[in-house]
């Protein structure tokens, strides 16, 4: 048995081809800062150079309060995280102190905090860091700012600490966006 195309089949095929012709790869969308608080927005004249997702732990240590030496509290001691690209491939690490971002290619940098802003209950704050010049050539060369966004977790434990020197690790996740000058 032989089947023959009908006029409706021809119209469907023409419409399908026309639709396929309109589907083009769209250019990569620039990271938008519109939803971020003004203090942690990167100044104009910069563009996104690298986007990573950091997952790891924040370590807190029980230390004497500055204004009450007979009392103790949780104090930020440092981060340790794996940095992955948007496809899930490990591309670096983040650790401290001092806060250090290190790419898999060996380039690394430190920075100075410029601003923070609340990122919701139970989450570390948004953060804007001014990068120091990178050590070693690679992905981090020329980075001017690092932005911490899309935060999940990482705040100090809710249970009070009881003994100086006690440590606790809290898991967190954040996007680290690296910006270079235009």
Say what each PLM segment does:
Residues 2-13:
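Bacterial N-terminal signal peptides that target proteins for export
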Residues 7-9, 29, 45:
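Intrinsically disordered, low-complexity segments enriched in proline/serine/threonine
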Residues 31-59, 66-182:
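Primary mode marks residue(s) on the alpha4-beta5-alpha5 output face of response regulator receiver
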Residues 23-30:
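Sec/Tat signal peptide C-region and signal peptidase I cleavage site
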Residues 12-21:
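Bacterial N-terminal signal peptides
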């Amino acid at each position: 048995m032989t089947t023959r195309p009908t006029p409706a089949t021809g119209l469907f095929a023409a419409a399908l081809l026309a639709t396929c012709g309109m589907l083009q790869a769209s250019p990569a969308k620039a990271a938008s800062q519109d939803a971020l608080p003004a203090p942690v927005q990167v100044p104009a004249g910069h563009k996104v150079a690298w986007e990573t997702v950091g997952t790891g732990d924040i370590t807190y240590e029980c230390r004497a309060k500055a204004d009450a030496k007979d009392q103790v509290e949780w104090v930020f001691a440092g981060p340790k995280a794996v940095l992955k690209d948007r496809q899930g491939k490990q591309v670096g690490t983040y650790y401290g102190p001092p806060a250090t971002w290190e790419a898999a290619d060996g380039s690394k940098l430190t920075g100075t905090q410029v601003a923070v802003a609340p990122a919701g209950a139970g989450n570390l704050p948004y953060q804007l860091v001014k990068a120091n010049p990178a050590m070693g050539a690679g992905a981090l060369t020329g980075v001017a700012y690092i932005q911490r966004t899309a935060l999940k977790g990482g705040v100090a434990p809710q249970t009070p600490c009881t003994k100086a020197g006690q440590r606790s690790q809290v898991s967190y996740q954040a996007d680290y966006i690296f910006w270079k000058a235009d």
